[in-house]
Structure formats: C-alpha cells, structure tokens
C-alpha cells in the first residue's frame, strides 16, 4: 500500500478535477463521454447539459449541438453496466454491452420471468425487422406489434426492448422530434471492439473499464467500482490484480480513515495535486470564491461512487429525497446542498433552486452565473 494518505478534502478536489467539473478542458461531447466511459442518461437533456460542463467553455455546443452528436451516432444510449440507460461512445458500445450483458440479464431475471420475455421471440423479430428499415419510436414499435396481433406495452415492452439491446440487436437512433428512437445496433455501432481490437476478451474488457474509470474518477474503493459498474467485488479485485503495478492502493485519512482507495500509478496532476484546478471555474479564478454546480440528478460525480458518495452530499441532504420535479443536484464547492429544476419553453427557460439551507450572497451570485450558463446552453432567456 502507498505511503501517501488522502483525506476527504483531497479526494473531493481530485474528483472534481478528474471529472473535469473544474478547469474543464475536453473538446467535444463524444470525448467527454469517452472520458467517463459511460454516463447515466435516462434524463437525456440534463445528462447532455452535464457533459457540456466538462468541455472547454469555448467548445460548448449548446443543447442542439449536444443532441446532434447523438443524432449522428457518435454517442448512443443503451443499457450497459447496470439495468438503466447510459450514454456511451458508439465505438465503445459493442465491448461494453458484451461485457455487461450477462450481469444485467441476471439482474433483470425476475422481471423477465414476470413479463414472459422468453416467450416473445416473435415480437423481438418484428421489432428488429422494423428498425432495419429505419429508426422507430417506442410508440411506433408498440403500434406495429399491435397491428401484427402481438400487442405489448408498458413494462413488458420495455423489457423486451432492453433484452434486444443487451443482445446487440437494438441501440438508440436519432431523435424523431422530441422522441427517442431505436435503431439496428450494427447500423450505429462500428464493427470490432474498439480499444480491445477485433476480438472480445473479458479480462481485457474489465481492465479497460477499470483503467478508464480510475482515470476519470480519481480515487475509489473496490465497493465504489463494483456499485458503479454492476460487477462483483471479485471481478473488481480480479481486474485490479490484472492491472498490477498500473494501480496504487492509498489509505484514507480523516473521514476516510480505514478505507482503501485506488488510483492509477501514473495519475495526472489533477489527481495528485488538484488544488490549482479546483477554483478555476470562477471567472476570476479565485479558489476561495464559492462555485455552484447545477448537476443532473444522475451526474457521474454521484453515481460513480457508492461507498464514498457521502463526500459530495452535505449533512442532512438525501440524494434520494426529491420534492416534486426538483430532481437535480445543486452543489456548492462540489457538495450537494439542495435541488434545482429547469422548465424549458419555446422562448425561455425557468431555472428554480430549492436550497436546503440559506445561501450566502456569494453563493446566490454563483447560482445566478449558472443560470446564465443554462440560458446560453438552451439559447433562451432565463428566468428564476
């Protein structure tokens, strides 16, 4: 184990810097997705907003530009790692799905049996044939099945479609207006296994996943990795063993005393000395000035960690405690202290906070700066 010690302050700063939520320097949305490997994405537009926060300010494409990267197929949305939507680069999709499909199928087993997924082979064949003609919305697919005398809807349809995604038959297509579509997997995903080459190897895939996870998440425990990835503790320890001298075990201090955290042996300065990076989001670069982040409800700053997630949550705040449509996380200096929501209209966007404590004047001003960023992102007048 390394002789260095890391406390909660260092780990939080390193995570903010590694996630590129401080001193953001990534050039485009696909690069940001690839940096994070997989980004939880059932909240589609908020997830894209979160990705654009990790780009250089002069490289941020706005909402329409972020969607365009998905429409072009540079980024796709599918079920990987855990049984929920994630955004991934199209050239990572094949190996990520093949790696995680057995675990997700296992997690879905009870629901598969409940809705009778195994008995819906004909329905799957109809869906696959339809998307080979052109991308289809879920509503279109439901209508097509009904027209063929095989109606499916609700949860049953959802699990049939998810199983087809995990079997590498379906993946997201371009938006149809405001609606998501399904497309043929091979039409949107390149052949081969991206960084793994032409053949899939499970050990190589686990190593690739863990190496890239640590590069973008800084420090994490074995349980953090397992909870994020959906793999077992045994799988994670096996991957760490395969990485060998490429990773370093670091003992925690302070609130992390007793924990063993892992980082890459060649971790960059953002991880080893994050101080110079973490105050740079403020216009004047003053590290003592509070920085507000408007984070989507499933931002990777939260979802990447289970065991040590409390580092980013203020005392008395529960990430699962969502009041109405205020589902997103309002953070000050990387720690969630409230909720926020946006309501996007044709000409304006309303941004509303729910502070769980009274903000200081400086924090309120920092929030207003982020409201202005939302206005720019959507190309609409902002109201609060």
Which role does the model predict for each range below?
Residues 1-153, 317:
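Phosphate-backbone binding and catalysis cores of DNA-processing enzymes
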Residues 60-68, 151-163, 233-240, 322:
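Short amphipathic alpha-helical interaction segments
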Residues 71-80, 84, 165-175, 244-252, ...:
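A short, conserved structural fragment
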Residues 87-93, 176-196, 256-279:
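Short, cationic-aromatic polyanion-contact patches
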Residues 98-109, 186-209, 273-285, 292:
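Short, amphipathic alpha-helical interaction segments positioned at domain boundaries
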Residues 118-135, 202-218, 240:
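Positively charged, polyanion-binding regions of nucleic-acid-associated proteins
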Residues 242, 246-315, 321:
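Non-catalytic regulatory appendages
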Residues 314-384:
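Glycine-rich, small/acidic residue-mixed loop/short-helix segments
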């Amino acid at each position: 184990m390394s002789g260095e010690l890391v406390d909660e302050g260092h780990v939080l700063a390193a995570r903010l810097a590694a996630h590129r939520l401080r001193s953001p320097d990534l050039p485009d949305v696909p690069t940001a997705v690839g940096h994070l490997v997989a980004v939880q994405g059932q909240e589609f537009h908020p997830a894209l907003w979160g990705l654009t926060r990790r780009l250089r300010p002069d490289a941020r494409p706005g909402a329409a530009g972020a969607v365009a990267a998905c429409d072009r197929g540079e980024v796709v949305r599918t079920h990987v790692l855990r049984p929920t939507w994630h955004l991934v680069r199209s050239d990572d999709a094949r190996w990520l799905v093949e790696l995680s499909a057995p675990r997700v199928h296992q997690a879905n087993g009870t629901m598969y049996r409940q809705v009778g997924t195994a008995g819906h082979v004909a329905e799957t064949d109809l869906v696959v044939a339809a998307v080979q003609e052109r991308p289809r919305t879920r509503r279109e697919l439901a209508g097509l099945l009904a027209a063929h005398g095989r109606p499916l809807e609700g949860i049953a349809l959802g699990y049939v479609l998810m199983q087809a995604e995990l079997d590498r038959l379906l993946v997201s297509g371009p938006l149809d207006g405001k609606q998501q579509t399904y497309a043929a997997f091979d039409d949107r995903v390149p052949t081969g296994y991206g960084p793994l080459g032409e053949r899939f190897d499970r050990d190589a895939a686990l190593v690739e996943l863990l190496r890239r996870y640590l590069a973008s998440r800084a420090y994490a425990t074995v349980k953090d990795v397992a909870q994020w990835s959906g793999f077992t503790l045994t799988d994670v320890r096996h991957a760490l063993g395969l990485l060998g001298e490429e990773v370093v075990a670091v003992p925690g201090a302070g609130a992390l005393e007793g924990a063993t955290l892992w980082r890459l042996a060649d971790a960059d300065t953002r991880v080893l000395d994050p101080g110079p990076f973490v105050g740079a989001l403020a216009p004047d670069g003053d590290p003592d000035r509070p920085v507000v982040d408007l984070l989507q409800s499933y931002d990777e700053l939260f979802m990447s960690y289970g065991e040590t997630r409390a580092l980013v949550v203020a005392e008395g705040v529960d990430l699962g405690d969502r009041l109405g449509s205020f589902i997103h996380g309002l953070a000050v200096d990387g720690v969630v202290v409230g909720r926020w929501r946006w309501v996007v209209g044709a000409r304006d966007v309303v941004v509303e906070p729910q502070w769980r404590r009274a903000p200081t004047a400086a924090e309120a001003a920092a929030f207003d700066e982020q409201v202005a960023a939302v206005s720019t992102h959507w190309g609409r007048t902002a109201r609060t």
